[in-house]
Curated annotation (Swiss-Prot):
The gene is GALS3. InterPro entries: Glyco_transf_92. It holds the Pfam family Glyco_transf_92. It comes from Arabidopsis thaliana (Mouse-ear cress). Residues 242-456 form the GT92 domain. This is Galactan beta-1,4-galactosyltransferase GALS3. Disruption phenotype: No visible phenotype under normal growth conditions, but mutant plants have reduced content of beta-1,4-galactan in leaf cell wall. Expressed in root caps, mature leaves, top of the stems and seeds. GO terms for molecular function: glycosyltransferase activity. The chain crosses the membrane at residues 30-50.
């Protein structure tokens, strides 16, 4: 009896198993097929050549072929012709008189027609546009500019005027030269008088007699109610600063300690109502930025990152463009604007102050500053070598070069509202008088090359009032050294001891 029951139970289990397999037959087939494929691949894999591969680049290639078939939406401003025409290939031909007529077809662009950096209002009816353009184009060609104002108010018609170009680089340009375009709408009393907003468009024409290409560039947009017209009325608006420093392009491996000395010295020299604008062309590395950071936090320094201008090969890291941008950006914010380098230190006589000197020069739109060339390699060791090496650079670099030369470079200061464009050593585009004999009032001491030395500056110590070093005569001049301790004390009181461990 037990045997019969056991057989019946086995029969039921077999039927149950068959039922389950039958219900899931499709899924089991797929599973077995997948296992078969995997086993086949595992068997064949050792026989596949190693050069065979399927990388992400193969997928990108497929995707790119698909995406290239999708057209992109582009907008081109055209005047007389497209700004990017496809040149037609003209074949050489033989004229009736037997002369072979040769043809020339241009492709691509060796340099941009115009590289826009900035544009600013220069008054109620004028603007300044700052940028770069092809140097050969301006030397040998005849490019021109037209300025157009398009109001956001649809009831106002666009107005235009001829742009007056100013080339500021005095022949120093390379592939690119600096161009300042003055847009003065003299036919009207004010542009955007209702403060309804609008856009300034610069039309830059190459002047090609055959194919006169024009690029239309939107260089400035004024939102509604954004213009303070009182800013351009000197009798109504008080300047934010008395003195503003416009720095040139800073590049290379600059010394943090030399920058530290320079900024502390001049913040003290110019006083509370002053500001410093510096431009980083690659020279403000991390250690230099740490030196500037306390002064930035106090609102005494503004730093501009201009490293992208390196794409365009202009003179000295596009120095002329940078100083002109600074001129027009801060033109109505300061009474006086100074242009000199970070290895140069201004000085006024002991009984004078910078305020008294500037008051005596108010009748001039510009004055130049005489150079006192200092050695950046030999030091005065009046207190002994041990103490000398612990001093700041300006406290021990005390020997002035007295070799007679025809002329030395000067630096300068301007009242910016009277200046339309500027240079490195002076401005030639201004209204008003220039004064060149201010040496009894103000001078600058130039420590050439010291800013780029990442080491102790003293190569040799002297204790004499007159020395000859490498065939150059020097005399002892402690003018800047004498204020070194006061500058160090000023820095400590102003920003604390956070820079005490600054490296050379």
């Amino acid at each position: 009896m037990a045997m019969v029951k056991e057989k019946e139970q086995n029969t039921k289990d077999k039927k149950l198993l068959v039922g389950v397999i039958w219900n899931f037959s499709a899924e089991l087939k797929l599973t077995f097929m997948a296992l078969l494929v995997l086993c086949t691949l595992a068997t064949l894999l050792p026989f596949i050549p190693s050069s065979f591969s399927l990388s992400t680049s193969d997928f990108r290639f497929c995707i790119s072929r698909f995406s290239s078939a999708v057209p992109l939406n582009t907008t081109t401003t055209v005047e007389e012709s497209s700004s990017s025409p496809s040149p037609e290939k003209n074949l050489d031909r033989v004229l009736d008189n037997g002369v072979i007529k040769r043809t020339f077809t241009g492709y691509g662009s060796a340099a941009y027609n115009f590289v826009s950096m900035s544009a600013y209002r220069g008054g109620v009816n004028s603007f300044a546009v700052i940028g770069l353009s092809s140097k050969p184009l301006h030397v040998y060609g005849h490019p021109s500019y037209r300025c157009e104002w398009v109001s956001l108010d649809p009831t106002q018609d666009p107005i235009s005027t001829t742009g007056f170009k100013i080339l500021t680089d005095w022949g120093y340009g390379r592939i690119y030269t600096t161009v300042v375009v003055n847009c003065t709408f003299s036919s009207i009393s004010a542009v955007n008088p209702q403060n309804s907003g609008g856009t300034l468009i610069l039309h830059a024409t190459t002047g090609d007699p055959t194919l006169n290409l024009t690029d239309s560039i939107s260089v400035l947009t004024e939102p509604p109610k954004s213009v303070d017209f009182d800013l351009y009325n000197s009798t109504k608006k008080t300047k934010k600063y008395d003195y503003l420093y416009c720095g040139s392009s800073l590049y290379g491996n600059l010394s943090p300690q030399r920058v530290r000395e320079w900024i502390a010295y001049h913040v003290r020299f110019f006083g509370e109502r002053s500001h410093f604008v510096l431009h980083d062309a690659g020279g403000i590395h991390e250690e230099v930025f740490e030196v500037l950071k306390p002064w930035i936090e106090l609102g005494r320094v503004t730093l501009h990152d201009i490293r992208d201008q390196e794409r365009f090969d202009g003179y000295y890291h596009n120095q002329f463009m940078i100083v002109n941008d600074c001129l027009h950006r801060y033109r109505f914010m300061t009474k006086w604007m100074f242009f000199f380098d970070v290895d140069e230190f201004l000085h006024v006589p002991v009984k004078e102050t910078i305020s008294s000197v500037m008051e005596s020069l108010e009748e001039y739109s510009q004055f130049t500053i005489e150079q006192m060339p200092m050695s950046s390699r030999i030091c005065y060791s009046g207190d002994g070598p041990a103490r000398t090496y612990r001093k700041w650079g300006i406290e021990k670099l005390a020997y002035r070069d007295v070799k007679k030369v025809p002329r030395r470079d000067r630096k300068y200061a301007v009242q910016p509202e009277n200046v339309f464009a500027t240079g490195v050593h002076m401005s030639q585009n201004l209204q008003g008088k220039t004064y060149h004999k201010a040496e009894s009032k103000i001078r600058y001491f130039h420590y050439h090359g010291s800013i780029s030395q990442r080491r102790e500056p003293c190569r040799q110590l002297f204790n004499d009032s007159r020395v000859v070093f490498e065939n150059t005569p020097y005399v002892l001049d402690t003018t800047i050294c004498d204020v070194g301790l006061a500058v160090r004390t000023f820095e400590l009181r102003t920003i604390g001891d956070r820079l005490l461990r600054t490296r050379q």
